[in-house]
């Protein structure tokens, strides 16, 4: 059985994938001990909302107090880069293949969805974290909340 080769993902498409992954991942408290995504997604959303005003404030404040332009711009660029780092990490995580322990769990969740009568598309190649996020989102919508207890 040959798996299709995945081409490397471009640097800029990782940001779009990270945004999609953040929207897809179910933010359930029961997933937090196993997956770090809950914390990263919350921190990234917070940074997207807070860092642009902080960058503008620090830029204006340093210039108004007679500071030099170079450090002011560097501080503003650093503040603006924080949400981008979160999106980049999420994008990189979304295309990472699942490790064997989580892969077994992924197939168990898919099996529970199929037992419940849900039609699922076949998995192509090795599943990644985006496929896990899609499956978990669907499981949280269509299965009862106790499906995680059995796994």
From Swiss-Prot:
Record keywords, A-Z: Cell inner membrane, Cell membrane, Membrane, Transmembrane, Transmembrane helix
Membrane spanning stretches: 46-65, 69-91
Presence of the UniProt keyword Transport in the record: no
Name of the featured protein: UPF0208 membrane protein KPN78578_26420
Subcellular location: Cell inner membrane
Membrane topology: Multi-pass membrane protein
Gene Ontology annotations for the cellular component aspect, listed alphabetically: plasma membrane
Signal peptide coordinates: none
Protein family per UniProt: Belongs to the UPF0208 family.
Domain of life, source organism: Bacteria
Keyword Aminoacyl-tRNA synthetase: no
